[in-house]
Amino acid sequence: MEYDRELHTEEMTLNFGPQHPSTHGVYRAIFTLDGEHIVNVENIIGYLHRGMEKLAESRTYTQFIPYTDRLDYLSGMLNELGYVQTVEKLAGIEVPERAEYIRIIMAELQRIASHQVFLGSMALDLNGHTPWMYFFRDREKVLDLLEMVCGSRMTTNYMRIGGVSYDLPEEFMPSLKSFLNDMDKSFIEYERIITGNEIFQARTKGVGIISGEKALAYGLTGPNLRASGIDLDLRRDAPYGIYDRFNFKVIVGKDGDCYERWIMRIDEMEESIKIIKQALEQIKEGPVLAKVPRLIKPPKGDIYHQIEGAKGVLGYYIVSDGCDKPYRIHIHGPSFVNIGAFPEMATGSTIQDAVAILASLDPILGEIDR
């Protein structure tokens, strides 16, 4: 049978989110589809906006610490570390050496816990229910350690301007060493269960590729940038705290696809363990909190400080007018930048690949919307 007219398809609009298990929060994307292929992506954010930066203006410098836990709520210790270090630089406060080591241990444990959520969630997004349980099993061990130290598993409120709130309990060190030893076995399990799985590799290799040049142009940082071949890690290149005392390898990929971003997190957890082990060898007894005023009043001025968070560069810009409350705070969150590259990476892919691409960026809406 012959037809004297051409067959064609019409473009279709699909709302992805804001309440969808694969959006990792209340995030919405509008896909324009030609069949199953995405021809355009529009980011819609703001559903979780809480006015964090404005709230800071009516809180003392110390009172704002718990609010930072609610940014990337999977990386509370890292959020707190970046904030208190910024205030310390502005106020000229020296931190006791033991507190510096405790901060490093807590920060790297938090990095491991954050990466475990990334790995488990991405596996689950690709229908990997069994791997998800393995990753979250090990994350529970980290959260138990955090709870042992500060009494909370996620919103820790542990860092203080001038150190940490209190010293490590006696049972912490043996429990930490046991966990670090157990992780050697876990890495072997990860490889066997999912990383080396042919189906998983088919879903992630060559998917969501972004070049190093484009990654830099979009402002990507952290594992997402290093997966595209850019060798940049603030812990090594602009060391803060006492990171210059530790030997570790900066993991750098080359392919810039979903699989490479996955490998970044696996390998970075191993490096975090190396850092923690070195810190355990070097830490000495001493005070954990400097003598600072109850109401901290930094001199007039402004400062910007950034750290290497679990998802990328986390920065704080603080303006002080000399009183006990910040005049202005701006938070540079890596997830806000990373999600901006999603349309570029998802355009031309299929819907199922877009799920993998979004998961590989590891966004978290508490940090995007603030």
UniProtKB/Swiss-Prot annotation:
Family: Belongs to the complex I 49 kDa subunit family.
Bilayer topology annotation: Peripheral membrane protein
Protein name: NADH-quinone oxidoreductase subunit D
Organism for this UniProt entry: Clostridium beijerinckii (strain ATCC 51743 / NCIMB 8052)
Subunit-level organization: NDH-1 is composed of 14 different subunits. Subunits NuoB, C, D, E, F, and G constitute the peripheral sector of the complex.
EC nos: 7.1.1.-
Keyword NAD belongs to the record: yes
GO CC terms: plasma membrane
Stored InterPro entries: NADH_Q_OxRdtase_suD, NADH_UbQ_OxRdtase_49kDa_CS, NDH1_su_D/H, NiFe-Hase_large
An MF annotation (GO) of this entry: NADH:ubiquinone reductase (non-electrogenic) activity
Function: NDH-1 shuttles electrons from NADH, via FMN and iron-sulfur (Fe-S) centers, to quinones in the respiratory chain. The immediate electron acceptor for the enzyme in this species is believed to be a menaquinone. Couples the redox reaction to proton translocation (for every two electrons transferred, four hydrogen ions are translocated across the cytoplasmic membrane), and thus conserves the redox energy in a proton gradient.
Record has DNA damage as a keyword: no
Enzyme category, top tier: translocase
Cross-referenced Pfam families: Complex1_49kDa (PF00346)
PANTHER family: NADH DEHYDROGENASE [UBIQUINONE] IRON-SULFUR PROTEIN 2, MITOCHONDRIAL, NADH-UBIQUINONE OXIDOREDUCTASE 49 KDA SUBUNIT
SUPFAM superfamilies assigned: HydB/Nqo4-like
Catalytic activity from the UniProt record: a quinone + NADH + 5 H(+)(in) = a quinol + NAD(+) + 4 H(+)(out)
Assigned keywords, A-Z: Cell membrane, Membrane, NAD, Quinone, Translocase, Transport
Gene from which this protein is expressed: nuoD
Cellular compartments annotated: Cell membrane
